[in-house]
Amino acid sequence: MVLEAWLDAAIGGVIGLLFGSFLNVVIYRLPKMMERQWAAELAQVEASNQGKEPPEDTQPTFNLMTPRSRCPACGHVVQWHENIPVLSYLFLRGRCSSCRTRISPRYPLVELATGALFFFCMHRWGATPTGLAWCGFSAALVALAFIDWDTTLLPDDITLPLLWAGLLASALQWTNVPLFASVMGAAAGY
């Protein structure tokens, strides 16, 4: 039983590292995606106010999946083996493999934080709906914390699903927070 708990925690930690790598993409791209959307909406309003046709969006696709991650200094496309959480950063000594520009230590920090939180959640609650719910909440909060630090924004794309997921988890008794307390917290926080 004890070995199983540690195995769940170790697997959770590794999965957390992988999620942390994806969260780095979310933290970097989601605010930029929001800014692009705001600019497009503003251009449409301005065109409408001037009686013109709204401008066509000619910018290349930019979302959480496209384009592939690149070095901001030289444009080198990050290969799969350069994107292994924490290990690639250590192997590359914190530098781009192409131009040797320094990579922020924040990337492995996000990965390690997410891995540690998933490890804790899986150790505390095991591979149960409760453990998985807390892993999801932890991942969302890591993304929100870093986005807030960078931009002072808390994107609705994360906060609103988090609110509903919290209420659902409470209703299904996956947390020890009573549903009434969750609803009151959601009402007060929103």
Language-model segment annotations:
Residues 123-130:
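Transmembrane helix-loop-helix
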